[in-house]
Amino acid sequence: MRAPLLCAVLLLLFVGGAAAADTNRYSYLSVDRVAINLSGTEATVVVDYRVDPGIAPLVAIFGRGDLHQKVRRVTGFEDGRIVALSMERAELVVEEAAMDYGEGSYWFPAHTFGVVVPSLTISTPQSTRQLARTDTFSRGIGYFGVPPTPPAA
């Protein structure tokens, strides 16, 4: 049992080094797109990716703990809570991703990703920004929260 596990670990190490040539790759993940939806101070991050076909069976057999770490690293949200994870997509919730400036105004600061993201979408209640082939969201974005609905009379 130790020999196959050792072979799998060594294979993962070699794949990580070979993957460095592709800018949207990190180890055995190739990122296709990232969508960030901002609401209040919370961000919901959806990342679509591909797992190398040779590694996919190993991830399925040995568990997805390493995949969790890699998804957090490529998104740059190491403290994000993964709420859904598959071999093609992950959804993270990041608490306190934006700063609350009071009176319903928020600021999502500049952010750096662990890879070059081919397609990045950042949505607020007021607007959507789309960027292509970037590893940073360099300017940040200000927005207003959705006003609470008044109670029915």
Region locations from a protein language model:
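Secretory targeting signatures
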Residues: 1-22, 47
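Lumenal/extracellular ectodomains and adaptor appendage modules
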Residues: 18-153
